[in-house]
Amino acid sequence: VYIRFDYLCLIFETLNIKITTLMLQKTFLARCDNRACLAKTNIMSGSPEAWLSNDLLSKSNTFGLTFDFFVDWAINQISPYVWIKRILLPTYTYDEFIGKLDSEMEKEFGKDYLCRLGRFATEYDMQIQFIVFHDELDWSNDRNELLIVSLSFKEGCYSFSPQKYSLSGFKELIKSHSGGPVSIGSKGLIYGTSRLECSLSKTDSLYPGDADLLLLNEDNKAVCILEFKKHTLSSPISEQCFTNYYPRPDGRKYKRLALLRDYLASKSNSRILFFVLYYPTQTYIEQQWKLEVIEGNAFSLRATDSFIFELPADKSDNEYKKVIEKISQVIAARS
């Protein structure tokens, strides 16, 4: 049955049901050469992003942040900029978004999340910036524009400062934060979270990598970095281990995360843990996930312990809570 959207709105208005229209949407992982081809996921259990959502984490006085961050590779140190990206829907202009900036940011992220981000930035001496862009644009054209919205946080209140950048200016900003040009080769990424990221992966202004999840405690202190490692093959999850990927082919990725761990630890004078969580996308192999504890300095990392658990039997909150409990137990044993 097809119902016109304006008729649907009239029905909702008559029933006093409010429709919240969002200008922003999250980026998503898909093939760079075909954005309709999404990355594989486990259809029975879902993904760690769902298992460890803030709706569930908050019930155990824990909070998670996901963001992109920079390493200045000229000095092997963290550049204090946190980027959080969002796509602006094509029906809205940048100026329309700026005109409703406060309300749209609050609708997308929530006031509590924004306050936590602000406190985190203050505690760890970092600048939070939101990268907002029209992803349908031709990102090979250096004249195309995007928006950077900087978050300020003073005396418990946040505010936003937007600034438009041309793609050429954005590339220079990436190089500045990265300690110079940075690339992965002319072929670029196979999978990316946006057309923008995919396009930049073929240049010497590579979009920064991410922290899949940084866990904060009830005092907003960083506790643990979690890297999610998707297993798409048919081999047992028990065969997934750190030495499969470190020091090659993913040494730089893990070095980045270890440098972030060390930066945060130095700012808070506390120990921060580093885990890799392996999970399968295939449903015909044994349904388990694996957690490895990673230790050592950023230039010489190693796995010191590992644990294997049953995957969530379904996509229910009760099953996901079991994952949170297992991770919390491993953290508690090492705190």
Q: How does the language model describe each region?
A:
Residues 143-169, 286-335:
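Active-site or metal-binding loop neighborhoods of secreted/extracellular toxin and effector enzymes
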